[in-house]
UniProtKB/Swiss-Prot annotation:
Catalyzes the reduction of the glycolytic intermediate dihydroxyacetone phosphate (DHAP) to sn-glycerol 3-phosphate (G3P), the key precursor for phospholipid synthesis. GO terms for molecular function: glycerol-3-phosphate dehydrogenase [NAD(P)+] activity; NAD binding. This is Glycerol-3-phosphate dehydrogenase [NAD(P)+]. The gene is gpsA. Pfam families: NAD_Gly3P_dh_C (PF07479), NAD_Gly3P_dh_N (PF01210). It catalyses: sn-glycerol 3-phosphate + NAD(+) = dihydroxyacetone phosphate + NADH + H(+); sn-glycerol 3-phosphate + NADP(+) = dihydroxyacetone phosphate + NADPH + H(+). Belongs to the NAD-dependent glycerol-3-phosphate dehydrogenase family.
Length: 338
């Protein structure tokens, strides 16, 4: 039995913690909110984030990070990008007080606002190597709402430490949740962030009344942009065509369960970005990621017309119809060109 602390009791953190608990592991789910911990422990529910789910009897929640982390083999951080540094600082202090080293994992898909750093870079800066034996990422096509219902799901666990990725693989895998491993931490994180941009565009197309043809064209042409930027930044090309890349792109770009897709849907229906954000009441990671990747495209001299169009809609108030018209009116090219 492996001891695992999951930091963050949102929908995805709860779903991953519940999966590991159902697999027979000692799982402690940390939350900022004491009332949420009480609900999870007493009612075996998390109604704010997974209203229809009944959680494992083996899942224990706490608002005390030291209780969650003590003697753990793995700490899995599953908080929004904007909260990663704050939680990482608290985790570093907790590990120092406990004088304890763990395998550090995360399942957050995004880039830091302002610095555009990947999650692993943020965690590495805040948590000394003394307290982390390895750093890995969980990515791939996985909506929490489906995982908690035991829908068939496959994810990828990326990192250079094979012992660490294989341990987390064993902790999470069962008959309905299958984890694979890869060695490309950078690519796994980068592609997980990039697909959020595409999901906004895909949702916007549906909101405007376009059909599957338009969505398929968007997703396929976006793959070309993702490939070019990924290679420029040091990702492995094969990762793009695996679960962390195209797998995540498909599920996020086609499913109403995706908050980025829903954000795009609202924009396509004529709502402002502020209205969409207020209506959802949740973090839309793709909005910040769009600005980051637009800046990356200029820094690495990669032409990314779809990303540029979505950036102009989000940040320059360019009408969606005009952005689409500009994309469709570009000079005709070979399919392998941007």
């Amino acid at each position: 039995m492996t001891k695992i602390a999951v930091l963050g009791a949102g929908s995805w953190g709860t779903a991953l913690a519940n999966t590991a608990a159902e697999n027979g592991h000692d799982v402690r789910l940390w939350t900022h909110h004491s009332d949420q911990a009480v609900e999870i422990n007493h009612n075996k529910t998390n109604t704010k984030y997974l209203p229809d789910a009944t959680l494992s009897e083996q899942l224990f929640a706490t608002d005390d990070m030291a209780v969650a982390v003590k003697d753990s083999d793995i700490v899995l951080c599953v908080v929004p990008t904007k909260a990663v540094r704050e939680v990482a600082k608290q985790l570093a202090d907790t590990l120092a007080q406990l004088n304890h080293q763990v395998i550090l994992a995360h399942a957050t898909k995004g880039l830091e606002q302002g610095t555009y750093k990947r999650i692993s870079e943020m965690l590495s800066e805040e948590i000394p190597e003394t307290y982390r034996s390895a750093l890995v990422v969980v990515s791939g096509p996985s909506h929490a709402e489906d995982v908690i219902k035991h829908d068939l799901t496959a994810v990828s666990i990326g990192g250079s430490d094979e012992n660490a990725t294989k341990l987390l693989q064993r902790v999470l895998s069962n008959k309905t949740f299958r984890a694979y491993t890869n060695h490309d931490l950078l690519g796994s994180e980068l592609f997980a962030a990039l697909k959020n941009i595409v999901a906004i565009g895909s949702g916007a197309l549906v909101g405007l009344g376009y059909g599957a043809n338009a969505q398929a064209a968007l997703l396929t042409r976006s793959l070309v942009e993702m490939r070019q930027l990924g290679l420029a930044m040091g990702a492995q090309e094969k990762t793009l065509y695996e679960l962390a890349g195209i797998g995540d792109l498909i599920v996020t770009g086609m499913s109403p369960n995706s908050r980025n897709y829903r954000a795009g849907l609202g924009l396509g229906q004529g709502k402002s970005l502020k209205q969409v954000s207020d209506d959802m009441g949740m973090v839309i990671e793709g909005v910040n990621t769009t600005k980051a990747v637009y800046d990356f495209s200029q820094q690495y001299h990669v032409d990314m017309p779809i990303t540029k169009a979505i950036y102009q809609v989000l940040y320059d108030n360019k009408p969606l119809s005009e952005a689409i018209n500009d994309l469709m009116s570009r000079p005709l090219k070979s399919e392998d060109a941007l």
